[in-house]
Curated annotation (Swiss-Prot):
Organism of this sequence: Methanocaldococcus jannaschii (strain ATCC 43067 / DSM 2661 / JAL-1 / JCM 10045 / NBRC 100440) (Methanococcus jannaschii)
Transmembrane segments: 22-42, 219-239, 246-266, 273-293, 320-340, 351-371
Pfam families registered for this protein in UniProt: MMPL (PF03176)
GO cellular component: plasma membrane
Full protein name: Putative membrane protein MJ1562
Amino acid sequence: MVVLMLREILKKVAHFSEQKPFLMLLIILIITVFAGISATNVKSQTAFEKMLPQDNPIIKTLYEVRDEFGGTDVITICIKLKPSDSSDKVVDIRDPRVLKAIKELEDNLRYVDGITSVSSPVDIIIQKNNGIVPNDIDTVKDILNKLPEDKRKRIFNSDYSMTVVNAYTDAGGDQKKLMRVMDDVNERIEETPFPPGVEVIATGTPPMRKLMDELMKESQSFTTTVGLIGILIILIIYFRKPLSSIMPLLPVLIAVIWTGGAMGLLDIPLDMATAGIGSLILGLGIDYGIHLMHRYDEERRKGMPIDKAIETAVVETGTAVMATTATTVVGFLALVLAPLPMMANLGKVCALGISFCMVVVLTLLPALIVIEERHIMPLIKRLKGDTQ
């Protein structure tokens, strides 16, 4: 009963796509435009605590600590010596020029919105020198020698080639705020006039989150592009016609855009699990297009007219595709039950993506086939005839 009902629905879809292919194309394109706009609202999520169950006592306590005592994330700014050809280069991190630059950097960081406090072990040297930076390295050494050994070890490393500045941020899981804070911190670092022979690098959890954000976006673009090119090459080898090779790929590409739109609409973030969703959907969804195209070509070789070949391909292939989609979606939706939010997000996105592949392939691909057969191919033949 259910199968018969599905076959009847598929038959109507096939007739609509065959009789009004341009209208079907227009409908799909309009939806795709809105999905593309929604996809721009997808947020990146690199906060480790957001990837864990939010009702866990450890995570709840973390949020309480942030609310009561401010930021818990530390940006560690490492100031260290580096090779330099300059005759004026720094050879000892205790150089007063370095200390003055550190003091200036600290003062500038305090004005960054989102930085709650800034501290450096070097501060104690300034305090011991009546609140000003010593003018010569010998004074710095004298102050250090008068300090207890445990304090002295926390200011510089053993060979006096490195020290750190710690900046505390209250950005927490707010991804946009953290990215803005890191941009401002890096800008302050660039503006600070450190002498030659000194390298300044921000590290710690916030900088690593920014790096992860950049790498996720880069990986998403790269893997999707590589997957797209690889699939296109295989389709060209299989179908041996450029136009027929592109057609099964277009619905899957549109499904990827729809998936991005759904992520923006449902507030599903781009995280470590969902970053590769584009290539994943391409790999899973292209099967549907290949099966439908192959069945259509098979029916045409038997001598069937376009309308009958489209109907047979959509109905016969469509029922199998819908069954395959249902089983795949159930498998992906099982991930929604996972305690890790990012695994649940992956399950949701994969289920949406493969469902969109099915819908777009069964509606748009028949319309594209009809447009190719009835409009594009005759036009190409006429153009070839005119040139001859």
